[in-house]
Design a protein with these regions (language model features):
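Loop/turn-to-beta-strand initiation segments
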Residues: 177-182, 303-306, 354-358, 390-395
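Conserved ATP-driven motor cores of ASCE-family P-loop NTPases powering translocation/secretion/packaging/pilus
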Residues: 71, 218-221, 384-388, 393-465
């Protein structure tokens, strides 16, 4: 069915259409050009009225409205349509843009299900269902899991727009294929995920396995406390690392340094005392986090499971050290595994993971910030560059794209973009997503919960999708405060009534 015509100036990548009805943003159309049928995506749409264009007052508006209602030619429906490629090629996974722009007057048709099904729902084990096209809900949308692991993914959205639901869905689909997922859970959003084969781990840090700088961060010694840092560095010897009573040995070593320097360097007495206070805190306040007897934290991760590394009880610095440690160990393990498999090269240790791993960093702006160098950022950057060669995929999840390191974001081969209103965030996304236009980015402010623009290598084409809801996810949703208060009030009334009866009973007894 013809729904419009190409008008004005057209380009190989974009046309303007005059339609018989308003075209919805995200709607797919067919441009029936001389070279073949071309698929287009509506990016912007405008509705105009000749009668109501230049009204000056209310009475004139009323009269003009009456004229507009009886004049079939009054309304104009104009749309900007992005050209995606020839349909027959897209159905084979090839995006071929026409060399010659569609001529003005070219017919624009409504896209049918048979035109879209093969493009957005390809066959193959690597393609998994993730939702349905927003404007064509009868069309199933699939994404390529291989591309997620080999080329990484960024999931960017405001709080409450469905980021953790999408992470849960991807994790569930990977796990259905016996894959291994690791989620760094900074806000305890995933520990109650009711999915089979889930492994929840309270992330612990073994101080013996750290270097002096990392230990200083874990103990929360300030960066500008140079003397404290120096004392810790001197005390953190190989012998201390190997001593059974780790904290006691470290404290004794600090005391020895204080005594050796108390005459010549009096500042060592105060600073050394502060280090000892930090060691005492580690033994008592942070004993459930810092455990010298956990010899291999990586050993707690199970292959073929969804592993939730709960780092919600760690401070920001401690979490940074924990994330960097796990990322480093996982990358090294995957390197050893690939080398042992393909090069027949002997390694110092037996690899723990025999197949690819997908790692998700929640609240990624905390660990890979734009303005600061952190250890987690270093290893995340290394995985973003090298992970594809060793089967280690990275998922970066954040509600503050503007605060993320742009070099790492630029290496995310795929993006899921949900509702974002900050212009700085939108600018960061525009620079990271080459295959998405500024016009389409501007529309993300109008997306609803669960809606996402999918771009990059995990989809055949940029698409606006409503993401499938994960019913097993019970945490992370907004709380219904009004209902909770109503229930609390009801129980309060019951409690008061019960108390009054007890009082009356006691009075009767007396």
């Amino acid at each position: 069915m013809i729904i419009g015509y190409v008008i004005g100036e057209s380009r190989p990548t974009k046309i303007t259409a005059l339609a018989s009805r308003p075209l919805a943003i995200g709607e797919y159309t067919i441009i029936d050009s001389n070279e073949g049928k071309i698929l287009g995506l509506v990016e912007r749409t405008f509705v105009s009225s000749i009668a109501l264009a230049d009204v000056k007052n209310f009475d004139e508006a009323v009269e003009s409205k009456e004229i507009a209602e009886i004049n079939r030619r009054d309304k104009g429906y104009t749309s900007s349509i992005m050209i995606l490629g020839f349909i027959d090629k897209l159905q084979k996974g090839q995006a071929i843009i026409p060399a010659i722009p569609p001529l003005p007057g070219t017919e624009i048709l409504e896209a049918k299900s048979k035109d879209l099904e093969k493009i957005f729902g390809p066959d193959g084990a690597q393609w998994i269902r993730i939702g349905n096209l927003l404007r064509n809900p009868e069309i199933v949308t699939k994404v390529n899991l291989n591309k997620i692991v080999s080329r990484h993914i960024g999931i960017l959205a405001m709080t409450g727009m469905g980021k953790s639901n999408l992470v849960s869905l991807i994790a569930k689909k990977i796990n259905n294929l016996n894959g291994t997922v690791i989620i760094f859970d900074y806000h305890d959003d995933y520990s109650n995920l009711s999915i089979p084969k889930i492994n929840v781990i309270d992330a612990k840090i073994n101080p013996r396995l750290l270097d002096a700088e990392s230990l200083g961060e874990v103990l929360e010694i300030r960066d500008n406390a140079s003397i404290q840092q120096r004392i810790l560095r001197m005390a953190f010897t190989k012998q201390v690392k190997e001593t059974k009573d780790f904290w006691g040995a470290l404290n004794d070593q600090v005391e020895e340094i204080i005594q050796l320097n108390k005459k010549d360097k009096k500042e060592y007495t105060y600073s050394g005392g502060r280090v000892q206070d930090k060691i005492d805190d580690a033994q008592h306040k942070f004993s459930d986090i810092l455990d010298p007897d956990v010899m291999d934290p990586i050993g707690l991760i199970k292959e073929g499971r969804i592993n939730i590394l709960n780092i919600s009880s760690l401070s920001e610095k401690q979490a940074n050290v924990a994330v960097s440690y796990y990322l480093q160990e996982l990358l090294n393990d995957r390197k050893d595994s690939v080398r042992a498999k393909h090069v027949k090269q002997t390694t110092k240790r037996n690899p723990r993971f025999s197949s690819s791993i997908f790692v998700v960093i929640e609240e990624a702006h905390v660990f890979i910030p734009k303005t600061e160098d952190t250890q987690a950022k270093y290893w995340a950057s290394k995985i973003a560059r090298e992970g594809r060669k060793f089967g280690l995929g990275l998922g970066v999840v954040s509600q503050r794209p503007r605060s993320l390191d742009p070099n790492i974001v630029s290496q995310m081969g795929s993006l899921a973009i949900m509702k974002i209103v900050q212009e700085d965030d939108q600018s960061q996304i525009t620079s990271a997503a080459e295959s998405i236009s500024k016009n389409l980015i501007e529309q993300i402010t109008s997306l609803n919960v669960g809606d996402a623009i999918l771009v990059g290598q995990w989809v055949n084409l940029p698409s606006i999708v409503h993401i499938e809801e994960v019913k097993e996810k019970t945490m992370g949703a907004d709380q219904d405060a009004v209902t909770e208060w109503a229930v609390a009030k009801k129980f309060d009334g019951i409690a008061k009534e019960s108390t009054q009866k007890l009082i009356q009973k006691d009075l009767l007894v007396d």
